[in-house]
């Protein structure tokens, strides 16, 4: 929470006499650079973001009642949990158990930057987390002329082997977002932009588009500001990329294999990737050629039986 949060303001005023002092991680024997007269734990060194004590039942109850109010008053269908990797696992389990009672299809989406996503995702934790592992490969595989990177990342996460990490899960997949440089600024060759979106819409998971990127707008993450990533846009700028992404989204939406099917690499080179998504009664092949020249691939494509989605 911010320093202006009412319970924290009460602690600033009443110190150890505040009934909310245990809502935070506080040491009255210390101080801060803001001279509060006590030390408090903050998020990753940012003193304007005060860390709540999620082991305190009163804090948890306050949050749960707020969530209940949002559901009853506004009909929300889920929560995106910022920096979910910082949350205690026991708290995540409590949150999941509570929200399951509000709506059977209420979704918890957690932000996770790395590590084993199963730490925060599962039947008693978040339904899904952000797939930063494959986000990086979506652009660097093209820039480095190394489609092995994204191919191996997807196979590690979703491949047919019994040891793969997230088979059956729906990680949130993205090419850019509010915290990272936009895809159109990241890729060295603009012609690779539609190819990256083809992989995004074809790979397992739940694809997400960051506003404006469907038009191909650029934006660099700054050292001190994210303003360039988050412009105020007046009107849509529909173009060929927008139309291409709309076609990809429609193909995915109408395909059981692309939505829920298995994953298998069929062909993989530095500049080409073909992977298979398969569900009962449907087999889809996603083929991407990052080279500037045509490529002849030899594999079982089901000639005479296939059609272009």
Question: Language-model features: where?
Answer:
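Substrate-binding/active-site clefts of carbohydrate-active enzymes
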Residues: 1-69, 73, 95-101, 118
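Structural preference for beta-strand elements that scaffold enzyme active sites
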Residues: 76-80, 105-109, 129, 170-173, ...
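Active-site-proximal helices and loops of the catalytic beta/alpha 8
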Residues: 2, 8-13, 68, 72, ...
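Acidic/polar loop patches that form or flank catalytic/metal-binding clefts of enzymes
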Residues: 109-110, 207-212, 256-262, 307
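Surface beta-strand/loop "capping" patches
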Residues: 260-282
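Substrate-binding cleft of secreted/luminal carbohydrate-active enzymes
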Residues: 197-200, 204-218
């Amino acid at each position: 929470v911010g320093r202006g949060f009412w319970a924290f303001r009460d602690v600033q005023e009443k110190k150890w006499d505040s009934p909310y002092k245990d809502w935070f991680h506080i040491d009255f024997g210390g101080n801060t650079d803001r001279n509060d007269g006590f030390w408090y734990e903050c998020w990753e060194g940012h003193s304007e973001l005060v860390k709540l004590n999620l082991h305190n039942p009163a804090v948890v109850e306050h949050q749960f009642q707020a969530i209940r109010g949002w559901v009853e008053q506004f009909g929300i269908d889920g929560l995106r949990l910022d920096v979910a990797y910082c949350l205690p696992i026991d708290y995540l389990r409590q949150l999941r158990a509570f929200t399951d009672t509000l709506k059977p299809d209420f979704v918890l989406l957690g932000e996770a930057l790395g590590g084993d996503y199963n730490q925060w995702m599962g039947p008693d934790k978040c339904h899904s987390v952000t797939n930063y592992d494959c986000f990086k490969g979506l652009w660097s595989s093209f820039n480095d002329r190394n489609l092995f990177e994204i191919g191996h990342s997807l196979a590690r996460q979703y491949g047919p082997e019994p040891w793969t990490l997230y088979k059956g899960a729906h990680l949130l997949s993205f090419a850019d977002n509010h915290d990272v440089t936009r895809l159109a600024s990241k890729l060295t060759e603009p012609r690779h932009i539609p190819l990256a979106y083809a992989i995004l819409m074809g790979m397992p998971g739940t694809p997400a588009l960051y506003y404006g990127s469907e038009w191909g707008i650029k934006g660099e993450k700054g050292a001190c500001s994210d303003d360039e990533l988050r412009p105020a846009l007046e009107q849509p700028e529909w173009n060929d990329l927008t139309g291409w992404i709309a076609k990809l989204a429609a193909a995915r939406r109408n395909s059981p294999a692309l939505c829920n099917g298995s994953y298998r690499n069929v062909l993989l080179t530095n500049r080409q990737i073909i992977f298979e998504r398969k569900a009962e009664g449907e087999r889809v092949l996603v083929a991407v050629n990052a080279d500037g020249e045509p490529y002849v691939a030899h594999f079982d494509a089901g000639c005479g039986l296939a059609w272009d989605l």
